[in-house]
Amino acid sequence: EAFLEVKEYKDKGVPVVGMYCAYFPTELAMAVGAIPVGLCSFSNETVTAAERELPKSMCPLVKSSYGFAIEDKCPFFHFADLVIGETTCDGKKKMYELMAEFKPVFVMELPNSQSEKGLEFWRREVIRTKEYFEEFFHVIITDEMIHHAVHLSNEIRRSLKELCEVMKLDPAPVFGTDIQKMINGSKYRFDFKTTPELVDAVTEKILEEYHQGKHLESRPRILVTGCPIGGDTMKILEGIEENGGVVVAVENCSGVKTLDQMVDETQEDIYGAIAKRYLSTGCSIMTPNDNRIELIGRIIEEYHVDGVVEMILSGCHATGAESIYIRKFVNEEKNLPYISIDTDYSSADKGQISTRLAAFIEMIQADKSGKKELDMNYCYKLIVSGISGGKCFEEILQNVWDYTGVPVRFL
């Protein structure tokens, strides 16, 4: 339906701006009367096509995105008048260079620090992008236009944030997979004015039914963090909830992370306010990335989290390296169990992921009940599975730890 809707807007002469990243201020596109839309990047379907040109070692998100573009299998990319890139990871930067050979691409230069210098640089970049939009779309963005776009975007964010916050209830009212599907789906509603009202109605219905006693049974409450979640990587959320857990929050940039902060509409310098809001996003390309740690800490407390699952896409070196800090923070400061899942967009590892998540959730359930009955046969299976899968000794021990709760250094 979203494909048909965007075509209808194009037929009416409404421009489309495609994007791949949460750092792009969508208010700029909305201010010129364009539709900002996330481009296809979550399917294994186009990875093989991309690998004809890109290294196989690149992350699946980049390969999927590029594959959709060169195969013309993403209607949103097809109808996009302009694609907005950003200097986040190295893979994306090179992808944008290649895309520019067959599609208009504008790349925003993102600083890798959230310092005062970084903020001032980003503010100038937001204004440079605004000026480029004015030239490209032949529209002058007035103060009234940008303020209107900011207010509407804030209302959409507010409504989606409040939808996510129903998962603070214990027991959880619904499955987190359903909440995430609604969040993802909201990004493909292009009648922006009606979105807040529709989302609010869903939130109110969930709360009303909750107070009538309609909710899930008590389950281990899981926070998911790491690389972007959607499409084929929804297997992580599904694996958690199929094995007795419930995803109460998705911190990834397709979840709470992009909804947590609003643009300060009271600021006289509205472009400075836009820059501050977007630069505050905690992504592993930032150094240091204190904002992500701070947000994870708040989510753990506010959503009554029992355990943290981090999804790391193969080839995403920044998230992989930062997982060291996330594990340490969760284990040592929050005293909660943590597990990292390295994966890609294929379905080949779904069984293995399910096994690991089942053990992780079982461990949490045992801890919550005050019992710790370990199945040594299951430990043996984890070891044999690791050996047959070609894992190194430390990885195998890590899998056993994820189940037993005993740190590797003690095994």
Regions found by a protein language model. Name each.
Residues 79-87, 306-314, 385:
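Acidic beta-strand-to-loop metal/phosphate-binding motif
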Residues 11, 23, 28-42, 49-50, ...:
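Redox- and metal-dependent alpha/beta enzyme cores, enriched for Fe-S-associated oxidoreductases
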Residues 324-379, 383, 392, 403:
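Peripheral docking tails and interdomain loops at the edges
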Residues 66-135:
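Acidic/His-rich segments in extracytoplasmic proteins that coordinate ligands and/or metal ions
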Residues 16-70, 95-96:
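An N-terminal, globular interaction/scaffold subdomain
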Residues 69, 287-304, 322-325:
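A short, acidic, amphipathic alpha-helical segment used as a generic capping/interface helix at domain edges
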Residues 1-15, 127, 131-247, 251-259, ...:
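A charged, amphipathic alpha-helical module
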Residues 94, 316-322:
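Glycine/threonine-rich flexible loop motifs
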